[in-house]
């Protein structure tokens, strides 16, 4: 089976919240698991959603939109969804796509799901949401916030970005550019000779 179930679930959740008219692009199978014969027969090797997963994500979507603060941020008077962009940072080009651009509140909003909202600050560092926030806020010239829904508890959080969070994102972007240039733009570089050295 090709694909990652978490990516499919994340995409489905975004579509549920932002573009429910496009849900038909997702194939949903009524099966106990992806190891079952019926799933394998119907999926054709694709990564599909299980019906129970789609039902769980619908519950999360309903909880999110039942919260007045979140609903207003997502469905404000002047909002745009899935807004693409291209920005030059450190003399390299970066592609982006914002989930929500709220022009009323002057905010860029990213939807996230998590398995533990109490550890989201750690996840944000681990999954480089700091560099995402730096790139997006630089491009749109707006503050960025994350609306986060806990997949287990249904708890909702709104996380804004401190200056130190954005600065760390900027440093990661600079480091990524250095690595990119070393691996892809330096003809003398031999990847087999690359190693990391650190003192413990």
Region locations from a protein language model:
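Metal-dependent nuclease catalytic cores that hydrolyze phosphodiester bonds in DNA/RNA
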Residues: 1-96, 194-200
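Short histidine-centered catalytic/ligand-binding loop motif
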Residues: 2, 42-49, 118-127, 162-165
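Short, well-structured alpha-helical interface segments that form or flank functional binding sites
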Residues: 8, 95, 128-131, 135, ...
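Short, solvent-exposed loop/turn segments at secondary-structure junctions
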Residues: 18, 86, 114-116, 151-153
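Metal-dependent nuclease catalytic regions and adjoining charged, substrate-binding loops involved
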Residues: 54, 122-125, 135-200
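Coil-to-beta-strand transition motifs
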Residues: 91-95, 102-106, 142, 153-154
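Conserved catalytic cores of phosphodiester-cleaving nucleases, focusing on short active-site segments
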Residues: 96-120, 136
């Amino acid at each position: 089976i090709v694909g990652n179930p978490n990516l499919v679930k994340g995409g489905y959740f975004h579509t549920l919240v932002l573009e429910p008219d496009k849900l038909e692009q997702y194939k949903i199978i009524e099966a106990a698991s992806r190891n079952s014969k019926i799933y394998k027969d119907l999926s054709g090797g694709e990564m599909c959603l299980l019906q129970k997963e789609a039902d769980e994500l619908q519950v999360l979507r309903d909880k999110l939109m039942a919260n007045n603060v979140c609903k207003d941020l997502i469905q404000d008077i002047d909002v745009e969804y899935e807004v693409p962009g291209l920005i030059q940072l450190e003399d390299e080009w970066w592609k982006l796509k914002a989930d929500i651009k709220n022009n009323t509140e002057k905010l860029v909003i990213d939807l996230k799901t998590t398995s533990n909202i109490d550890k989201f600050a750690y996840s944000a560092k681990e999954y480089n949401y700091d560099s995402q926030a730096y790139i997006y806020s630089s491009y749109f010239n707006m503050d960025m916030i994350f609306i986060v829904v806990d997949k287990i508890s249904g708890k909702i959080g709104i996380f804004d970005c401190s200056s130190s969070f954005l600065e760390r994102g900027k440093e990661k972007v600079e480091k990524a550019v250095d690595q990119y240039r070393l691996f892809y733009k330096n003809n003398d570089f031999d990847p087999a000779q690359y190693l990391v050295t650190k003192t413990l």
